[in-house]
């Protein structure tokens, strides 16, 4: 058992426009060099663009749907047993699911070739809400890896 102190979880304030904790976390992950206002403007304009293209009522509904389609259920972790390393499938906790989904959406948006970051993020969110796009492919890839290593599930700790 570790002797270190248990760190206190920092409270992230909800974002000013939609009062959403998830969106606030998304803004923090997108942010570069502490420029939060830039990250906020990128996300808000991307959500407005997505709402124009979509048949949904609110952009938060679409954002939630995009996150749901990207959230992983299982992932693999390396476990060393008797000189060989196994990829052991483990279930992902809710907080990590959200974080991974957000990270993958932002990562996929940055790799796109659209003109501005707003446009790239809008396209990635729209694709993710429809169950396609690179972020959804990443999730399916992780699930496939966990499925193929199911035989090592008994090494879970």
From Swiss-Prot:
List the Pfam families. Ribosomal_S7 (PF00177)
Q: Does the keyword RNA-binding apply?
A: yes
- One Gene Ontology cellular component: small ribosomal subunit
Family stated for the protein in its record: Belongs to the universal ribosomal protein uS7 family.
Entry protein name: Small ribosomal subunit protein uS7
Q: Does the keyword ATP-binding apply?
A: no
| Species per Swiss-Prot/TrEMBL record | Blochmanniella floridana
Disulphide bond pairs:
none
Q: What keywords were assigned to this record?
A: Ribonucleoprotein, Ribosomal protein, RNA-binding, rRNA-binding, tRNA-binding
Q: What does this protein do?
A: One of the primary rRNA binding proteins, it binds directly to 16S rRNA where it nucleates assembly of the head domain of the 30S subunit. Is located at the subunit interface close to the decoding center, probably blocks exit of the E-site tRNA.
Q: Which GO terms describe its molecular function?
A: rRNA binding; structural constituent of ribosome; tRNA binding
Q: How does it assemble?
A: Part of the 30S ribosomal subunit. Contacts proteins S9 and S11.
Tell me which NCBIfam families the record gives. rpsG_bact
Which PROSITE patterns does the entry link to? Answer: RIBOSOMAL_S7 (PS00052)
A biological process from GO: translation
């Amino acid at each position: 058992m570790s002797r270190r102190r248990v760190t206190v979880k920092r409270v992230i304030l909800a974002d000013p426009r939609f009062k959403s904790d998830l969106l606030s976390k998304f803004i923090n992950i997108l942010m570069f060099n502490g420029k939060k206002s830039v990250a906020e403007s990128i996300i808000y304009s991307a959500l407005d663009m997505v709402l124009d293209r979509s048949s949904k009522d609110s952009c938060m509904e679409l954002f939630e749907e995009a996150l749901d389609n990207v959230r992983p259920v299982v992932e693999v972790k390396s476990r060393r047993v008797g000189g060989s390393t196994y990829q052991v499938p483990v279930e992902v906790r809710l907080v990590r699911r959200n974080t991974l989904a957000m990270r993958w959406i932002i990562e996929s948006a940055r790799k796109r070739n659209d003109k501005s970051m707003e446009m790239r993020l809008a396209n990635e969110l729209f694709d993710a809400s429809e169950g396609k796009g690179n972020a959804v492919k990443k999730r399916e890839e992780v699930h496939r890896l966990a499925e193929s290593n199911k035989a090592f599930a008994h090494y879970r700790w």
